[in-house]
Amino acid sequence: MISRKSPPRLAHLALADGTVYRGYGFGGEGIGVGEICFNTSLTGYQEILTDPSYAGQLVTMTYTQIGNVGVNPEDEEAERPHLQGFVVKEPFEAPSNWRSRESLPAFLERFGIPAIAGIDTRALVRRIRDHGFQNGVLSTDPSFQDEALSIERARSAPPLDGRDLVAEVTCSEAYQWSAPAWRGVAGQLPREPRPSPSFRLVAYDFGVKRNILRLLFDEGFDVTVVPARTSAEQVRALRPDAVFLSNGPGDPRAVQGVREQVRDLAGQYPLFGICLGHQILGLALGGEIRKLKFGHHGANQPGKDIATGKVAICAENHGYAVDADSLRQAGEPVEITHVNLNDQTVEGLAHRVRPLFSVQYHPEASPGPHDARYFFRRFREMVARRKAGEQVSGAQIAMGG
């Protein structure tokens, strides 16, 4: 919890529908404007805070106590947070964990992220659940506590629809990734050797999480990360064995030029997409995108493998989904491989001829369960078999064939 050595800093969260929640501020002093959402994960707040997929959003944690284990550099998913604000019931200033290097309030203050605590987060989550996404204004600035003005500002703020948020989070130039998954301090936990031979992989950075890159490296890929606007010609010049489409924030329809590049590359290279990358692949294959009422954000989403009937508990973080009917009508031989059991939205797709597949959820988790990490092994298998001259399809691999 936050110490009370000084008077609490007044803060409020005002929504576009006129609802106002009053609490106290911590972290950065300022104003955050964005789309309000909630995450149901009990742990992993640091990974959530540093996930670039949250650009343009105000994130509410449904679990009551946040910050207990502090913050450490190993668990960061990006160099800095990209979210607009953070909402919790009760933050902790004095963490207790041997890996902690900084408290949550200090971390948020360092990056200037405004946060509010002491509000009824259950009531807020119910409002989002019942009424859907809407904009909000979170102010921890003592000089800006005009709630009526905050409501008007929330109403006039642009929605996420149509905004190219990927342009705000992608890397500025290509780089090599060569860090493995974390295996304890000084690597004292056992590690399997990287598979051989290695394969050259170009990974599009739409807001990529570090744990995805770690797991791709661990599967024997020599990973070159490239900016989102990299052309198909530039990718071909790198002579990759495969292409990866990463996660990222916002509306996939708004990401400039990428759909056309992916459509070009999809006919030439094995391709795997996660989250936003899955949606962009769906667009490239002729599908359409629809916005969900309040999205899927959390580490406890049920994803069903249609071929086997098995259900994996998955980490998800998205407000948009590929429309199943549009995908079926697009004319491409595409298989819907996975669905979300809560609302039957598309969670996976694969091509029945070409080596292409993707998943909406996060097999790398971070945070979340590891039920779906096998997709990284399947991706490597698809690349290896295609490299050996076998005409294996994405559907064969995604469905375990």
Where are the regions a protein language model picked out?
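Cysteine-nucleophile active-site neighborhood
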Residues: 237, 241-242, 246-324, 368-386, ...
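Proline-centered loop/turn at the N-terminus of a beta-strand
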Residues: 114, 200, 270-272, 288, ...
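Active-site-proximal beta-strand elements of phosphoester/diester hydrolases
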Residues: 200-204, 314-315, 357-361
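Residues that mark the start of a beta-strand
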Residues: 198-202, 222, 270, 313, ...
